[in-house]
Amino acid sequence: MLFKVLSAAVYGIDANLIDVEVDYSGVVAEKDVFHTVGLPDAAVRESRDRVRAAIKNSGYLIPPTFITINLAPADLKKEGSGFDLPIAVGILGAYGALRVDDLSQFLVVGELGLDGSLRPIPGMLPVAILAREKNIPNLILPTANAAEAAVVEGVNVYPVSSLTDVLDLLNTSVVGVIQREPYRVNTQELLGELQHFSVDFCDVRGQQTAKRALEVAAAGSHNILMIGPPGSGKTMLAKRLPSILAPLTFEEALETTKIHSVAGVLDAAAGLVTQRPFRSPHHTISDAGLIGGGIVPRPGEVSLAHNGLLFLDELPEFPRNVLEVMRQPLEDHTVTIARASMSLSFPARFMLAAAMNPCPCGYFNDKSRECMCTPPMIQRYVAKISGPLLDRIDIHIEVPAVQYKELRGGAAAEGSAQIRDRVMSAREHQRKRFKKAGEKIYANAQMTTRQIRTHCELGADSERLLERAMQQQGLTARAHDRILKVARTIADLEGAEHLTVAHLAEAIQYRTLDRSYWA
């Protein structure tokens, strides 16, 4: 007897519909003979042992026979343990243990334990989105995956804890309608909750210039590099940067959750990523760990930071090849990983924050300690970061050591909430401007050269200032565009319609590594 069950496989951050066809011959054999066809990987081939034990330990005795399992379409490689449950349901359906013979209204996914219990699998959110796109109304999945799948509207999510629970659920259905309330979450309530951060900018004493630069970076989604001696507060500042970023929209939250779900790092209890990601990989990370890869391509740190912040501490300590692979994601906001069998793309629209010492000893240009490095040593150290990569960082800012009076005295520093209000006001200016122009971008950092010409017009005095800076500092055309983008953001923070000399001068000030004493 032939029985069909609908399931899904995840490739990249998207899911494909898979037909699980089970043929139960009924001819008694000495032992079960499983044949799985349709390009299964090792995990899928091993499912026969898990499925056989799960069926037996769930109380179903099926005589040994010849069973053929086809996973269609046959030209797609099937990977992972998510086919355990649909295969078991297909076998029991073919044997006659189900009172329904049409499961076309159900999508079934899950890994089985030997005792028949269900275990969660990564990538359930793309599966739920696939069910909605294919007009499959019901999704049966492990209980631990329910929260993330339920954020997709238009799909009835039914969490189950065991194979027996699945059969009870299906046997009580009437014409594809399950007699049980589906699992639901209120996405607006999740996103509407006040964000609580364990850190705040009011913790940071002094560093007003650096705080201002971080505010500008957050307002325009600009990449930023902080340069300063050990203990000056670079890492402390970077860890507080997420607290002034604008909240995620529902579309951004859904896209971010998809990536985290596929990578297997999603908090099962949360279901939806409601805060912008903050990723801070160690400098020993490989290029595959940073941008993604593997035999089965998985998202790397740049994709896990999508719609959020990627912080690289001690930037020159990262291997040169690791830093260079970031050039394409920083420019195109996507990562494409090519393999012999497939080519997958992962989104990587993130804000880069990096920190570094100014030299090997860490005290070049420091007022309180003498630098022990020679000029060639400093040049070699800074040269670890290539010019093309530096050009893609809009803001370079020096973070000097904090003086004792600033550390111990003075009024309380401004908190993250006040800074975030200004950032969100500037973002609203940008949103309205780009919407009015019919442009599908949301931040100044995303402007193309043509859009810069449209939105960053300069007066005569500003033109002369920019020309002088370009000549004196030997700036590239890309650095020219970065300065104008940052100047536009500074104007937005002030609510100004036109760029002034003051806006441009501040933006030029944020090109520390272009100055002569760094050359």
Label every model-predicted segment.
Residues 225-267, 332:
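Walker A/P-loop
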Residues 40-48, 61-63, 70-80, 297, ...:
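Basic, amphipathic alpha-helical bundle interface domains used for macromolecular binding and assembly
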Residues 226, 312, 355:
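Hydrophobic anchor at the beta1->P-loop junction of P-loop NTPases
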Residues 307, 313-314, 325:
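Walker B catalytic acidic pair
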